[in-house]
């Protein structure tokens, strides 16, 4: 991901240890920004061998579904130029039909993003951008995943609500909605050759997404090129929803 200049800017990427969040964090870093990332493990070294690269990034442990942890989270930030909320949770094998699991997924995917947005509102005021990482599930339900679907649908309307509430502070709020992207969370699909082939046949571009495909859109929405864009969602699914 290139072509952007974020020199002197400060970015916070939750869920920035792997996957889409890490791809966005590394894009900001290459463009000159100071980048703070969060993950759920105790130390950055605990991600060795994973699909991300934390070199040059400031790592903090944070479970964004834990309200007390978010309240106590205190990175060294006075001014924040972008908050990217990429942390997410999903449960398989019908676990999301259990109310405890349903609540746990919503805490990470919906309540956490709301708490983070309000927590850093003052630091973002005047120049900031919030980008939530939603999903094509923001627009339609996914069988077997009621919590994930509900949380991502809620995140879409939260984006619109906060765009109106925060606009007067000079804060833009947008959402990216990826289709199937190669990551640890989606490995159950792309690591199965038959499932992968079936999915790719449905995608006009005949491939699933890569984290960098989504990172480019995130960097755009956080950049001055998107200065008049707020309250919107950008679907990035290779044409699957066309």
Question: What do these predicted regions represent?
Answer:
Residues 17-18:
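Conserved glycine-rich cofactor-binding loop
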Residues 117, 151, 159:
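Active-site helix of classical SDR
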Residues 156, 173, 177-188:
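Short, flexible catalytic-loop segment of classical short-chain dehydrogenase/reductase
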Residues 91-106, 199:
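Substrate-binding pocket helix/loop in short-chain dehydrogenase/reductase
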Residues 167, 172, 229-231:
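Short, small/polar-rich loop/turn modules that mediate ligand/substrate recognition or access, typified
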Residues 135:
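Residue(s) in the substrate-gating loop at a strand-loop-helix junction
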Residues 207-236, 241:
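C-terminal substrate-recognition "lid" of short-chain dehydrogenase/reductases
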């Amino acid at each position: 991901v290139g072509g952007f200049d974020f020199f002197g800017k400060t970015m916070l990427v939750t869920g920035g240890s792997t996957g889409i969040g890490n791809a966005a964090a590394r894009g900001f870093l290459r463009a000159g920004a100071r980048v703070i990332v969060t993950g759920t493990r105790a130390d950055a070294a605990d991600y060795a061998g994973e699909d991300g690269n934390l070199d040059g990034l400031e790592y903090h442990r944070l479970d964004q579904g834990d309200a007390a942890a978010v309240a106590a989270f205190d990175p060294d930030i006075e001014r924040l130029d972008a908050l990217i909320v990429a942390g997410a949770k999903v449960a398989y094998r019908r676990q999301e039909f259990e109310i405890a699991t349903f609540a746990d997924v919503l805490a990470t995917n919906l309540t956490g993003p709301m708490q983070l947005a309000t927590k850093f509102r003052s630091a973002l005021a005047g120049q900031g951008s919030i980008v939530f990482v939603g999903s094509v599930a923001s627009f339609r339900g996914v069988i077997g995943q009621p919590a994930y679907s509900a949380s991502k649908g809620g995140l879409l309307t939260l984006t619109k609500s906060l765009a109106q509430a925060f606009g007067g502070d000079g804060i833009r709020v947008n959402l990216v909605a990826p289709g199937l992207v190669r990551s640890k969370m989606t490995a159950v699909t792309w690591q199965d050759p038959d499932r992968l082939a079936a999915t790719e046949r449905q995608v006009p571009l005949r491939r699933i997404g890569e984290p960098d495909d989504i990172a480019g859109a995130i960097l755009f929405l956080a950049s001055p090129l998107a200065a008049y864009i707020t309250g919107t969602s950008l679907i990035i699914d290779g044409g699957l929803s066309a």
